[in-house]
Amino acid sequence: MIIVTGSFTAEDSFLADALALSLEHVRRSRTESGCLSHAVHQDVENLSRLVFVEEWSDRAALAAHFAVPGSRAFAKAIGKFAAGTPTLSIFEAQRVEL
């Protein structure tokens, strides 16, 4: 399984637009093959900071996601809304039973 985390802090004047675009992006992404989960969360300590957590079945599914025109457009649009540089981290993981 591939886990992706990312975040950005929106300029205050763009927060509503950033929220709407982010929700549109995660809802579309959830329909893609290999997407196990995709969510956006608003940081309760900084409401302008949006945090993304994604789970993908494998690297091929994530690569396909990054190739979707909507994903590329989302990344470009976030750059216009962000106050600072967005973060993105990708991890390979396996589920552990306790």
Model regions and ranges:
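Active-site-flanking beta-strand signature of metal-NTP-handling nucleotidyl enzymes
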Residues: 2-8
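Short, surface-exposed ligand-recognition loops at beta-strand->loop->(often short) alpha-helix junctions
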Residues: 10-15
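Short, glycine- and small/hydrophobic-rich beta-strand elements in well-ordered beta-sheets
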Residues: 26-51
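Glycine-rich beta-strand-turn "strand-cap" elements at beta-sheet edges
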Residues: 2, 40-46, 74-98
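Short, flexible segments with low predicted structural confidence
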Residues: 1-2, 16-17, 33-35
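An amphipathic, aromatic/His-enriched active-site/gating alpha helix that lines ligand/cofactor pockets
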Residues: 20, 28-36, 55-89
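Hydrophobic packing within well-folded, soluble alpha/beta domains
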Residues: 6, 18, 38-40, 50-52, ...
